[in-house]
Amino acid sequence: MKQKTIGKAVEIVGIGLHKGVPVHLVLEPLPENSGLVFFRRDLGVSIPLEPKNVIDTTMATVIGKEGAKISTIEHLLSAIYAYGIDNLKISLDNEEAPIMDGSSIGFCMLLDEAGIVSQNAPKRAIKIKSPIEVKDGEKFVRVEPSEVSLFDFSIEFDHPAIREQSYRFTFSTKAYKEEIARARTFGFVHEVQYLRSKGLALGGSLANAIVLDETGILNKEGLRYKEEFVRHKILDAIGDMALLGIPLIGTYVSYAGSHKLNHLLTKELLKEEESYEIVSLEDEAEAIEIEKVYATGE
């Protein structure tokens, strides 16, 4: 199986969730072995997508370099990962990626418009050999050995619209688009005033998030999936796993996970070199199976 990029440049204009300012996003092809590279057009600064460039995970995943930063990148990265894209220039003219509708389906549609093309260099993956876990009290995230990419997530909120939710998802591009991509970010009315006092959630609305009061959901259209809340947690984690730079072969288990825990797991995994191996997907039989995973179903 070969590395992939997009067939042509595509662009979209939106607003950032936390800063609420307009942003112009452009996606452009890059040569093989380039990786995923963010570029702040307004500042002229490139920020390669690497764990060392993560500077904050409080409310979103934020990367930065040379005084430039780009935040709320997880939904965009989730779609890029799901489409198996290895090399891409991600150019923005502001400090936050567009929130779209709070999910990643808009980015999937943008990638469909661009088209996905194979390159000459072989694709690589990080295959888990032994479990790695990161905990924060009762909360934890863990990766385990597996022959497929599988996400087994659970959350628990003391709210009548959420309570306990679990979802088990075997990764493929087609399944991602059907089961995960439309799951929206969510927040609570009682948190909004505090967040806005901190300069956050300024672009949030019922058009780009599930909003909950004390008793239920304020969005008139309701939920897109029965377990939309936990499915969005999977969407976020897939985006955070894109920081590895190559796809993960293993099972990702999470209870009450967060951007912070996802990032700590990535750092811990890369530190424990005996817990994984980098595999080339050149083996014909294995490549055929991986190609099936990244088939879009279009």
UniProtKB/Swiss-Prot annotation:
Cofactor entry: Zn(2+)
Record protein name field: UDP-3-O-acyl-N-acetylglucosamine deacetylase
Entry's Gene Ontology cellular component terms: membrane
UniProt-annotated binding residues for Zn(2+): H75, H232, D236
Pathway(s) of this molecule: Glycolipid biosynthesis; lipid IV(A) biosynthesis; lipid IV(A) from (3R)-3-hydroxytetradecanoyl-[acyl-carrier-protein] and UDP-N-acetyl-alpha-D-glucosamine: step 2/6
Pfam family, one: LpxC
SUPFAM superfamilies referenced in this protein's UniProt entry, alphabetically: Ribosomal protein S5 domain 2-like
Active site (UniProt): H259 (proton donor)
GO BP, sorted A to Z: lipid A biosynthetic process
Keyword set, alphabetical order: Hydrolase, Lipid A biosynthesis, Lipid biosynthesis, Lipid metabolism, Metal-binding, Zinc
Membrane spanning residue stretches: none
InterPro entries to which the protein is assigned, alphabetical: Ribosomal_Su5_D2-typ_SF, UDP-acyl_GlcNac_deAcase, UDP-acyl_GlcNac_deAcase_C, UDP-acyl_N-AcGlcN_deAcase_N
Known catalytic reactions: a UDP-3-O-[(3R)-3-hydroxyacyl]-N-acetyl-alpha-D-glucosamine + H2O = a UDP-3-O-[(3R)-3-hydroxyacyl]-alpha-D-glucosamine + acetate
Gene from which the chain derives: lpxC
MF terms in GO: metal ion binding; UDP-3-O-acyl-N-acetylglucosamine deacetylase activity
Family statement drawn from the similarity comment of this UniProt entry: Belongs to the LpxC family.
The EC number(s) this enzyme carries: 3.5.1.108
Function of the molecule: Catalyzes the hydrolysis of UDP-3-O-myristoyl-N-acetylglucosamine to form UDP-3-O-myristoylglucosamine and acetate, the committed step in lipid A biosynthesis.
